[in-house]
């Protein structure tokens, strides 16, 4: 029998040993189990805010699933619900609140930000939210509203051209709008590297440290370029420590998680996990249409919805390429002196690799083949039934989707009835283990792989 109260006490004790006190209080103190369904194994958990919900789904859910399996030998399905309460902008999220420290003396006005290079278009007002970025956007708004308190550091990761820099700079714009004398430092990681090297050559290390360690908000883009640079990592570690201890906000972006950056020191990996690590994934069709609509409005273009829909359906990789496709359509319309319509868009984008032709193996195909192999149905694979004859095929289908396509974990979860990415991760890990110990599972996976790779 699964004793929810005892399990929760055990899980909390485990997490308390893995998180520092500030992080533990932030993520666990006000999070409570609500109910456990013994038939579906659904565990409902109450969290304080939408961002906390996203953090649990992305960062803690896998630990919760593994702990439940170790505790009771069962697979649970966590469901996170937001408790009614104040929004992040009005609540005081940490208990106890850190005591304000005296401000270090510094010149007033814009002296510190005169060299800042923020793109004036990268504001929250211009950011289009969708399923792939709503958690990151919510976290960025919370950080802009309460810098240095809760999601510190904020680590945004994802592919090229998905809006990481936009969100990061939006935080900077909002801080400067509210505090014109704030010291906001925005840099590419390569700039930090070059500044550090030059400070050694010119013996100006004190000036270098003054620049970075007295910031109110430090924004570091593409931090993966710190990979394999031990001296740079050492310097950034001390910069991080100084800012964090002074309760100053740190925001970083990367194309991957800290744990996936080659030779990134363990202490940096650990500190980057103190706050919130949040992924941005490629926009879905609805979001892509909204992005194009916003772009068309800003450029004064008259484009009907069907044409926007067509252009959006041709590019599903990133926002940069999506907007590039619209620019190409606009250019052809200008050259040919024609109105923009589907026919013109089709002609302008004819040399693009249409997404339908470039995706390769589809998750839907994997689901169909797996369902036929196990004599079940695709709706069952996407559903919530917990009987073994459906659970195992579902987990194998998720595993093969991960192995044979380039779909992200959240994307795979979406294709399996909207399951969160930690459920997919658990399924993939479980099948990977069983392949080594269970000849029946190994044989089934091998058969299916051969069928799908023909």
From Swiss-Prot:
<keyword id="KW-0238">DNA-binding</keyword>
<dbReference type="InterPro" id="IPR024633">
    <property type="entry name" value="DnaA_N_dom"/>
</dbReference>
<feature type="binding site">
    <location>
        <position position="161"/>
    </location>
    <ligand>
        <name>ATP</name>
    </ligand>
</feature>
<dbReference type="InterPro" id="IPR013159">
    <property type="entry name" value="DnaA_C"/>
</dbReference>
<dbReference type="GO" id="GO:0006275">
    <property type="term" value="P:regulation of DNA replication"/>
</dbReference>
<protein>
    <recommendedName>
        <fullName>Chromosomal replication initiator protein DnaA</fullName>
    </recommendedName>
</protein>
<dbReference type="GO" id="GO:0006270">
    <property type="term" value="P:DNA replication initiation"/>
</dbReference>
<dbReference type="InterPro" id="IPR010921">
    <property type="entry name" value="Trp_repressor/repl_initiator"/>
</dbReference>
<dbReference type="GO" id="GO:0008289">
    <property type="term" value="F:lipid binding"/>
</dbReference>
<dbReference type="Pfam" id="PF08299">
    <property type="entry name" value="Bac_DnaA_C"/>
</dbReference>
<feature type="compositionally biased region" description="Basic and acidic residues">
    <location>
        <begin position="101"/>
        <end position="112"/>
    </location>
</feature>
<dbReference type="GO" id="GO:0005524">
    <property type="term" value="F:ATP binding"/>
</dbReference>
<keyword id="KW-0067">ATP-binding</keyword>
<dbReference type="InterPro" id="IPR020591">
    <property type="entry name" value="Chromosome_initiator_DnaA-like"/>
</dbReference>
<dbReference type="GO" id="GO:0016887">
    <property type="term" value="F:ATP hydrolysis activity"/>
</dbReference>
<keyword id="KW-0235">DNA replication</keyword>
<dbReference type="InterPro" id="IPR018312">
    <property type="entry name" value="Chromosome_initiator_DnaA_CS"/>
</dbReference>
<feature type="binding site">
    <location>
        <position position="163"/>
    </location>
    <ligand>
        <name>ATP</name>
    </ligand>
</feature>
<feature type="region of interest" description="Domain IV, binds dsDNA">
    <location>
        <begin position="334"/>
        <end position="454"/>
    </location>
</feature>
<dbReference type="GO" id="GO:0003688">
    <property type="term" value="F:DNA replication origin binding"/>
</dbReference>
<feature type="binding site">
    <location>
        <position position="165"/>
    </location>
    <ligand>
        <name>ATP</name>
    </ligand>
</feature>
<dbReference type="Pfam" id="PF00308">
    <property type="entry name" value="Bac_DnaA"/>
</dbReference>
<dbReference type="InterPro" id="IPR027417">
    <property type="entry name" value="P-loop_NTPase"/>
</dbReference>
<feature type="region of interest" description="Disordered">
    <location>
        <begin position="88"/>
        <end position="112"/>
    </location>
</feature>
<dbReference type="GO" id="GO:0005886">
    <property type="term" value="C:plasma membrane"/>
</dbReference>
<comment type="function">
    <text>Plays an essential role in the initiation and regulation of chromosomal replication. ATP-DnaA binds to the origin of replication (oriC) to initiate formation of the DNA replication initiation complex once per cell cycle. Binds the DnaA box (a 9 base pair repeat at the origin) and separates the double-stranded (ds)DNA. Forms a right-handed helical filament on oriC DNA; dsDNA binds to the exterior of the filament while single-stranded (ss)DNA is stabiized in the filament's interior.</text>
</comment>
<comment type="similarity">
    <text>Belongs to the DnaA family.</text>
</comment>
<dbReference type="InterPro" id="IPR001957">
    <property type="entry name" value="Chromosome_initiator_DnaA"/>
</dbReference>
<feature type="region of interest" description="Domain I, interacts with DnaA modulators">
    <location>
        <begin position="1"/>
        <end position="74"/>
    </location>
</feature>
<feature type="region of interest" description="Domain III, AAA+ region">
    <location>
        <begin position="117"/>
        <end position="333"/>
    </location>
</feature>
<dbReference type="InterPro" id="IPR003593">
    <property type="entry name" value="AAA+_ATPase"/>
</dbReference>
<dbReference type="Pfam" id="PF11638">
    <property type="entry name" value="DnaA_N"/>
</dbReference>
<feature type="binding site">
    <location>
        <position position="164"/>
    </location>
    <ligand>
        <name>ATP</name>
    </ligand>
</feature>
<comment type="subunit">
    <text>Oligomerizes as a right-handed, spiral filament on DNA at oriC.</text>
</comment>
<feature type="region of interest" description="Domain II">
    <location>
        <begin position="74"/>
        <end position="116"/>
    </location>
</feature>
<dbReference type="GO" id="GO:0005737">
    <property type="term" value="C:cytoplasm"/>
</dbReference>
<dbReference type="InterPro" id="IPR038454">
    <property type="entry name" value="DnaA_N_sf"/>
</dbReference>
<keyword id="KW-0446">Lipid-binding</keyword>
<keyword id="KW-0963">Cytoplasm</keyword>
<keyword id="KW-0547">Nucleotide-binding</keyword>
<dbReference type="InterPro" id="IPR013317">
    <property type="entry name" value="DnaA_dom"/>
</dbReference>
């Amino acid at each position: 029998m699964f004793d929810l109260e005892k399990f929760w006490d055990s899980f909390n004790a485990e997490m308390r040993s893995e998180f520092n006190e500030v992080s533990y209080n932030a993520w666990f103190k006000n999070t409570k189990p609500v109910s456990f369904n013994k038939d579906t194994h659904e565990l409902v958990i109450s969290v304080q805010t939408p961002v906390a919900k996203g953090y649990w789904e992305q960062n803690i859910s896998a630990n919760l699933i593994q702990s439940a399996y170790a505790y009771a030998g069962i697979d649970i399905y966590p469901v996170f619900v937001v408790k009614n309460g104040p929004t992040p902008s009005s609540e005081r999220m940490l208990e106890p609140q850190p005591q304000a420290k005296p401000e270090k003396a510094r010149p007033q006005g814009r002296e510190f930000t005169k060299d800042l290079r923020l793109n004036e278009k990268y504001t929250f007002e211009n950011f289009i939210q969708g399923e792939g970025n709503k958690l990151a956007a919510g976290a960025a708004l919370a950080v802009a509203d309460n810098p240095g308190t809760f999601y510190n550091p904020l680590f945004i990761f994802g592919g090229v051209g998905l809006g990481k820099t936009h969100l990061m700079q939006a935080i900077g714009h909002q801080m400067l709008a509210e505090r014109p004398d704030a010291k906001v430092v925005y840099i590419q990681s390569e700039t930090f590297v070059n500044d550090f090297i030059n400070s050694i050559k010119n013996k100006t290390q004190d000036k270098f440290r003054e620049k970075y360690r007295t910031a109110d908000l430090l924004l570091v883009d593409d931090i993966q370029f710190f990979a394999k640079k031990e001296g740079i990592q050492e310097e950034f570690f001390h910069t991080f420590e100084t800012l964090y201890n002074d309760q100053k906000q740190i925001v970083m972006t990367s194309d991957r998680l800290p744990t996936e950056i080659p030779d990134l020191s363990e202490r940096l990996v650990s500190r980057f996990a103190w706050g919130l690590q949040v992924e941005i994934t490629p926009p879905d069709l609805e979001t892509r249409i909204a992005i194009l609509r916003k772009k068309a409005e800003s450029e004064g273009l008259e484009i009907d919805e069907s044409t926007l829909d067509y252009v959006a359906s041709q590019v599903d990789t990133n926002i940069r390429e999506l907007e590039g496709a619209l620019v190409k359509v606009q250019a052809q319309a200008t050259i040919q002196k024609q109105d923009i319509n589907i026919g013109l868009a089709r002609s302008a984008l004819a040399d693009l690799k249409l997404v339908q032709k470039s995706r390769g193996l589809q998750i839907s195909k994997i689901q169909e083949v797996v369902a036929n192999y196990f004599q079940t149905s695709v709706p069952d694979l996407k559903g919530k039934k917990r009987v073994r004859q459906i659970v195992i095929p579902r987990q194998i289908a998720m595993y093969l989707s991960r192995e044979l396509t380039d779909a992200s974990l959240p994307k795979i979860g979406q294709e399996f009835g909207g399951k969160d990415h930690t459920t997919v991760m658990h399924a993939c890990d479980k099948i990977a283990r069983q392949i080594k110990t269970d000849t029946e599972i190994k044989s089934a996976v091998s058969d299916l792989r051969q069928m799908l790779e023909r």
